[in-house]
Amino acid sequence: MTLQGKPYRLSDLIKQTGVRLTDCSNQFSDRFVSGITQIAQSVERDDIFVAFQGKTRHGVEFLDQVQSCAAVLTDNKGRHIMQSDCLPTRSTPILVTDSPRSDLIVLAKRVYPIDDIRIFGITGTNGKTSTMHIAAKLLEMMGISCGISTTIGSSASESDSCLTTPELCQLYARIFTAKQARADFFALEASSHAINRGRLGDIVLEVAAFTNLTPEHMEEHKNMEAYYQAKKALFLNKRSNSAVINIDTPYGIRLFKETGCSASVISENTKYGLDHKLFWQASVRRVGLSFGFTLISPSGYRVESSISLLGKAFALNTCMAIVILCNLGIDIERIDSVLRKAGGLKMVLPGRMEVFQTGNSPRVIVDHGHTVDAVETALVAAKSITRGRLITIINADGQRDPSKRKHLGQLCGAYSDKLFITDGHSRFENPAEIRRMILDGVEGPRKQVEQIPSMTQAVLAAIDIAKSDDTVLCSGFGDDPYLDVLGKKIPYSLRDEVRRGLERFAQGT
């Protein structure tokens, strides 16, 4: 279903753009438009269906999935395909443009005006989702409304929902919907794919934040330099008004140096930023199963609090979120006050180091982290709270950077007392080959390593052998709503399977 925007007569909307029309026998001046979408399955009668060239196929090839729409916006290649392949148009107006992206932005801004909402964005390899949700939670605690664009809680039927950053039309629509609901802010994750492919349109962020950069998406960027340059683009050419940069990594330091010294910087390591007037110092400490943190502002104001999420990274991401809010003009004393009154930040992020446990069952952790760095972070956190054995379930995505699979096997083998290698989003790769590549990374005796293709069976097997003081870590899948196999998105919930496994454990079967 397409999110509805501001209604226009199609003829009036066309006058405000430079699109060129093909000859159409039907009259369309009285047609109304109230939505724009690039997803064929969600097109409704009053929508413009946007059919441009995708990564592997052209959008007009999906016209047979469109039941009815106000018009089709395409490019010259799309028109050629329709003419040569005689694809059905059902007398629908066809709008042809020589400038697909720029015209799409003009249309999206008209139908989904977003000029009166303050937008901030977060980029980096790891920590985008949690930092965004933490920032939104802190705003909520202060009585300030914040819309978010997120993959958390999405369903298999939402075709773009598992994109870190939605397609351009969907992003504008979500921001507009938040604005209509009287949200004061909107937070988004800015993936390197979205930055490269123009999915952010001409949105200018009030604050852009950088978390970190570790190897990922090498199938897209080919090397780390290209990956870094994609991220860096968010901080250049007036794409953002201010910046917050984590300088605990070499790429963070480089980004700070290459984009000017006006950014706020945050670090655990004082030697990196003490001379900078906008330096924020963060430190983290273990508090039971959660983590406490101390954040010292450039003026010396000290915030001491904690977050209920498991893992040091979430405490550091909370510090990052606080700095972002301060850059948005939120008073640090106000943030400190709500944290003190609440006794820290208490929240759950589905699929992000999410803990499941009932009675005397083993602790089961479900985590979305699938990069080498994120998986190691999860392993360290899980190991640190485990009195018994750490039992790990790992998978790796098909058609996504195969070079990391051996490293995943090496890490999981080193930290785990028992390892199950299973299948995830194999896509069009042979899942057995993916498992073999992970297994190749496991060093030493492999008697504690088992391959179980079915993720459900792997979960049941892990819980069956676990004792009450053991931890089962399900790493790499999180709250994804489906399994992507051979072009089909099969509805699936790892979290539900974990719940069933724990119910079975409680029943002793």
UniProtKB/Swiss-Prot annotation:
Carboxylation is probably crucial for Mg(2+) binding and, consequently, for the gamma-phosphate positioning of ATP. One of its GO terms (biological process) is peptidoglycan biosynthetic process. One of its GO terms (molecular function) is magnesium ion binding. Its EC number is 6.3.2.-. ATP binds at residues 124-130. The keyword Nucleotide-binding applies. Pathway: Cell wall biogenesis; peptidoglycan biosynthesis. UDP-N-acetyl-alpha-D-muramoyl-L-alanyl-D-glutamate binds at residues 164-165, 191, 199. The modification N6-carboxylysine is found at residue 231. This is UDP-N-acetylmuramyl-tripeptide synthetase. It comes from Tropheryma whipplei (strain TW08/27).
